[in-house]
Amino acid sequence: MSTTENLVELEHLTKRFAVKQGVFARGKVEVRAVEDVSLTVRPGETLGIVGESGCGKSTTARLILRLLDPTSGTIRFEGRDISKLSQRTLRPLRREMQMIFQDPYSSLNPRKTVGQIVGQPFAIHGQKNAKTRVQELLETVGLSPEHYNRYPHEFSGGQRQRIGVARALALSPKLIVCDEPVSALDVSIQAQVLNLLRNLQKDFNLTYVFISHDLSVIRQIADRIAVMYLGRIVEIGDSESIYEHPKHPYTAALLSAVPRPTTGGRARIVLSGDVPSPVYPPSACVFHPRCPRFHEGHCDVETPPLRELSPGHAAACHYPLEKWPMTDDEIRQAEGAERADRPHLEGTAHEL
């Protein structure tokens, strides 16, 4: 990884949380929230991180900002290792890294005015008399300077999220982590906020890490996409490549669930079972208990590396997809009638 070309670099990043086994249990177990994640974020781009709830995407976002301390691995910002920096040493760097939170209702202090909320970063970093700058920020995000003395309860959800965006912009950061910033909003308001974020990125040369569980939202804003499952990145590549030529079965399943105006021959891939516990993850490939391309003695024994399958497109799968979309017949052929038949899928795995 080049430290001169990337704004953010993660190398073998791992985060585990110790939790009690039960009410009466004395021992503790580890929740493997993020496991051996390596990726880069380039200046001026939007990297989307997508996956089901509990896959580790929000934990990864907080690790990037050092809101959480990593268990192991390296976090670099502009080439500088910030993995083990103290909070005091990190403080000047906070100007360069900001966050937009998921819930616009709980992320704003109801006892403070909009002016106090947006102006808080200035106060923390010792900048006084920032009223004019705060009013300019409100205009920048589509609000009126007259809103300066109002309280959060006087605004709609979309307006509250704009206040959160203004707060994130206050110190002119280079990186903004957007943790599902539109998931709590109506669809029509989602589009407005996404358009705002795109325009701000162009105007201020911002870099985004955009977290979402919704692939249709990610597609509208991301330049590259990383797909996470059970704490690991299973696929990463350019947005167009991920959507048009997914290589990992999990990515294909997520894409098949995105509503489309016309099916166009694309079939729905329904995964069996639930997401395994991050306390006791499956051996080798963590996706193998739910995978329609499971090969006994291989997928459950050997962990697939995240390997490049085409320029800029990598997937962690022993048997990556070669065809997309798939028809109902092809999916049935790959899945087999019963789990017991899966060891015999070797012949069909290479046909898909």
State where each predicted segment sits.
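Conserved ABC transporter NBD signature motif
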Residues: 73-81
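Conserved ABC ATPase signature
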Residues: 151-155, 159
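ABC-type ATPase nucleotide-binding domains, specifically the catalytic core motifs of the NBD
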Residues: 18-27, 69, 84-90, 105, ...
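P-loop NTP-binding/switch modules centered on Walker-like glycine-rich loops
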Residues: 175-177, 181, 185, 189-267
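Short catalytic/signature loops enriched in Gly
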Residues: 4-6, 19-25, 30, 238-345, ...
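Conserved ABC ATPase "signature" region
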Residues: 81, 129-146, 255
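A short, proline-enriched helix->beta-strand linker immediately N-terminal to the Walker B motif
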Residues: 170-174
